[in-house]
């Protein structure tokens, strides 16, 4: 049974058990039989199919497979939300909201999402005064959310590690990009990163999956990180044994360098306050999962 036509899920669990009073939208292209979906608790078919969905509903009403009173009920359920949201928009026009409060909540959510995967010799948390080299494109331009249908507008400009490290108590000896996301290895960038790594107590490498490596609408054919990042981590561990890799990704990855780094922290897609959340974990202000 397709999810969008599953009465047990949409009616018996969602409405009867959970008390849901909103409306159900199909996944994009996830509607198989719109009339059957409406019969079993679905409301909107997305993306719009022109008039074909409407014709299916009219045909189902005429042949009795979709009772008109059920269609009326779905319309009432949908319109209840439409009217309520319209009124909320009118009532809220011109009102202000707590931007900093939202940002603080985003930071707390990110902090509680961070997972510590490796911590050899208790390299973490980093003590105040630790000299760190910050390496990686993700440190300057974080991948803080997904794309496509999951894209949302942050309440303020998303942070980067470079924005928050000054208040962390750590001493940043250098920042180097190290690699270009979505590109092949760049020898010049990698060389500069390796040189910076030689002069640090600890090297923080910010790596992970870029916007092309994982996305909606496709299945990954492998679990590798981009070659440029794996090669960079290998080169850095050859000149400094105190390496912590900070990951940003929405899914699982292979870590061929696992045995050669001392720390691995997974921040997933940390949202607009993900950088300060990660810094709080790295410096011990917050305990990771």
Model-derived features: where do they sit?
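C-terminal non-catalytic regions of proteins with extracellular/luminal or membrane-system context
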Residues: 1-7, 11-19, 25-34, 52-65, ...
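Structural preference for beta-strand elements that scaffold enzyme active sites
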Residues: 21-23, 43-44
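Conserved phosphate-binding loops in nucleotide/dinucleotide-binding enzymes
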Residues: 31, 36-39, 47
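Mobile "lid/hinge" segments at catalytic clefts and subdomain interfaces of large enzymes
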Residues: 40-46, 53, 61
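Long, well-ordered, tryptophan-enriched scaffold segments
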Residues: 41, 59-89
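Short coil/turn segments at secondary-structure boundaries
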Residues: 49-50, 73-74, 89-95, 125-128
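Short, compositionally biased low-complexity segments
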Residues: 49-51, 78-90, 134, 168-169
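Helix-enriched interaction subdomains in cytosolic or periplasmic regions
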Residues: 69, 80-113
């Amino acid at each position: 049974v397709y999810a969008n036509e599953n009465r047990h899920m949409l009616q018996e669990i969602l409405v009867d058990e959970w008390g849901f009073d909103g409306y159900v939208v199909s996944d994009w292209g996830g509607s198989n039989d719109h009339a059957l979906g409406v019969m079993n608790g679905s409301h909107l078919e997305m993306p719009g199919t022109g008039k074909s969905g409407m014709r299916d509903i009219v045909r189902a009403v005429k042949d009795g497979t979709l009772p008109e009173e059920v269609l009326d009920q779905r319309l009432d359920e949908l319109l209840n939300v439409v009217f309520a949201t319209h009124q909320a928009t009118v009532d809220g026009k011109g009102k202000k909201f707590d931007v900093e409060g939202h940002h603080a909540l985003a930071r707390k959510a990110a902090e509680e999402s961070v997972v510590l995967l490796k911590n050899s010799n208790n390299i973490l948390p980093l003590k105040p005064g630790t000299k760190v080299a910050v390496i990686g494109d993700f440190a300057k331009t974080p991948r803080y959310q997904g794309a496509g249908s999951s894209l949302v507008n942050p309440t303020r400009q998303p942070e980067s590690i470079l924005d928050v490290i000054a208040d962390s108590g750590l001493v940043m000896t250098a920042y180097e990009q190290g690699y270009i996301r979505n590109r092949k290895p760049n020898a010049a960038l990698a060389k500069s990163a390796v040189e910076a790594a030689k002069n640090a107590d600890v090297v923080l490498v910010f790596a992970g999956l870029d916007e092309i490596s994982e996305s909606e609408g496709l299945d990954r054919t492998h679990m590798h990180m981009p070659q440029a990042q794996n090669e960079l981590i290998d080169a850095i561990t050859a000149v400094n044994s105190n390496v912590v890799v900070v990951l940003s990704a929405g899914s699982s990855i292979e870590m061929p360098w696992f045995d050669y780094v001392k720390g691995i922290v997974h921040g997933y897609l940390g949202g607009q306050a993900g950088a300060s959340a990660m810094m709080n974990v790295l410096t011990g202000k917050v305990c990771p999962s």
